[in-house]
């Protein structure tokens, strides 16, 4: 399905606006990472596709440099795809026969294909099964949101996984529509979260930057005129364990000549790899960050997320990396918290979570607030402490657990609506922490 032509955004997503991402440098980092990761992922055994992905801008730019193809030629080809809504670059005007022959022989828009699509009953969400060139499968989810012009949101629901963005929405019948696409970064996952089916697979392969971007391309085609407003890397895999490929994919998504999304419209979700969170702050500070926290204490978190049990991944180290990211990005991370009945949904858990997020925020702002060692504590009015917290940029997403086969082996069950509402109320009213329940997850069971 062709996507209607749109004017370039005013986001200034120039390809030279990223820190440390000049062509040859990022290409060298990528090749080094691939060699280092081969023993753990089996990527050495993945056969190359017959043609490379044209959505992998590092591959395209490197090929162009090596073969004397000018950057403007690439811009013309990408314009054919993203501005004129064509499904191929092969008929781009004003490109020499020699250059087009080289590009056609070596690249295709997509190396993957959608082999299954399941849609929710109300049509506002969908899950695509994407088959990679070597037969491996990943999942990509599209979540639709609508709101009235006065801001009341429906379908997606409050707290739906979306990045902050001020890009253009589609308006119809007094409502504003937007789509968020949730993409995978790996086949399988090494994190082993006890409630997640993907973790039972282990890590099978890292996706290339092109394969990550192709999921967004498939989603654009599925969404048609409404297009894709936001991208969240919350699908299969741990994005920060496939760092260089994810970084190149982020660059393509926000590249003015390619997907042209605002950097703040793209969010990377992580279970918490402190060293890589710092790297992301250095390399792409304007991209959103979401932390899959899921527990307010180290002991409980290590039980739910085995990857959090090491000394390098403690809550203390994680807090320091979050503060570093906030200093460079100017905004706090979104805190993802899957709520499981009887495991992490009590008022005590909610208050521990409020204290944890509160301490993190205070430590980040302590130079601005003298004479206080606790949020809303002695010497500070409750209202004043709440206002500072609300301005911090941190946001807690309370996500109802969706039953899975692996979760059932641990006796995990979905929480009651009352428990979710109580947790949100405690965080908001007692701690001044912004918190919402992602009710759309209930709807996500359909797909």
Q: What annotation goes with each model-predicted range?
A:
Residues 424, 428-447:
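C-terminal accessory regions of radical SAM enzymes
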Residues 120, 184-185, 269, 292:
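Short linear Ser/Thr-Pro motifs
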Residues 220-427:
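Conserved AdoMet/S-adenosylmethionine-binding subsite of the radical SAM
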Residues 120-129, 151, 277-278, 343-345, ...:
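Short, solvent-exposed polar/charged micro-motifs at secondary-structure junctions
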Residues 2-179:
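Flexible, acidic/Gly-rich N-terminal and inter-domain linker regions that tether
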Residues 148-158, 163-166, 173-218:
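Canonical Radical SAM [4Fe-4S] cluster-binding loop centered on the CxxxCxxC motif
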Residues 70, 78, 173, 203, ...:
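Post-transit mature-domain signature of plant chloroplast proteins, especially small thylakoid membrane
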């Amino acid at each position: 399905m062709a996507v209607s032509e749109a004017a370039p955004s005013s986001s200034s997503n120039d390809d030279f606006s990223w820190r440390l991402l000049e062509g040859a440098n990022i290409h060298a980092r990528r090749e080094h990472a691939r060699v280092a990761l081969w023993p753990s992922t089996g990527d050495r055994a993945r056969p190359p596709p017959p043609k490379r992905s044209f959505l992998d801008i590092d591959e395209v730019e490197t090929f162009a440099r090596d073969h004397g193809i000018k950057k403007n030629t690439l811009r013309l080809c990408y314009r054919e795809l993203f501005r004129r809504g064509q499904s191929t670059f092969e008929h781009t005007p004003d490109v020499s026969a020699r250059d087009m022959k080289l590009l056609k022989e070596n690249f295709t828009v997509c190396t993957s294909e959608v082999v299954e699509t399941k849609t929710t009953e109300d049509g506002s969400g969908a899950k695509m099964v994407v088959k990679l060139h070597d037969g491996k499968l990943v999942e990509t989810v599209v979540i639709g949101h609508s709101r009235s012009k006065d801001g009341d949101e429906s379908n997606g629901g409050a707290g739906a996984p979306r990045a902050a963005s001020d890009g253009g929405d589609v308006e119809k019948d007094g409502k504003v529509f937007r789509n968020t696409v949730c993409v995978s970064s790996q086949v399988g996952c090494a994190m082993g979260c006890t409630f997640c089916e993907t973790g039972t697979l282990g890590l099978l392969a890292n996706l290339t930057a092109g394969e990550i971007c192709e999921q967004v391309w498939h989603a654009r085609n599925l969404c048609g005129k409404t297009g894709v407003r936001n991208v969240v890397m919350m699908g299969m895999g741990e994005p920060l364990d496939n760092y260089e490929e994810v970084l190149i994919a982020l660059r393509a998504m926000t590249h003015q000549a390619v997907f042209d999304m605002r950097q703040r419209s793209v969010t990377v979700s992580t279970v918490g790899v402190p060293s890589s969170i710092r790297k992301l702050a250095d390399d792409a500070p304007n991209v959103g960050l979401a932390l899959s926290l899921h527990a307010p204490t180290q002991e409980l978190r290590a039980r739910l997320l085995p990857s959090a049990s090491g000394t390098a991944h403690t809550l203390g180290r994680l807090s320091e990396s979050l503060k570093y990211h906030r200093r460079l990005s100017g905004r706090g991370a979104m805190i993802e918290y899957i709520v499981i009945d009887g495991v992490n949904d009590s008022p005590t858990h909610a208050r521990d979570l409020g204290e944890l997020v509160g301490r993190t925020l205070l430590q980040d702002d302590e130079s601005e607030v003298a004479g206080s060692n606790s949020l809303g504590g002695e010497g500070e009015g409750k209202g004043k402490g709440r206002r500072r917290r609300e301005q911090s940029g941190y946001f807690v997403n309370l996500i109802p657990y969706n039953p899975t086969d692996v979760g059932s082996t641990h006796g995990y069950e979905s929480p009651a609506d009352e428990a979710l509402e109580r947790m949100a109320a405690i965080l908001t009213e007692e701690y001044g922490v912004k918190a919402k329940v992602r009710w759309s997850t209930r709807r996500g069971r359909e797909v």
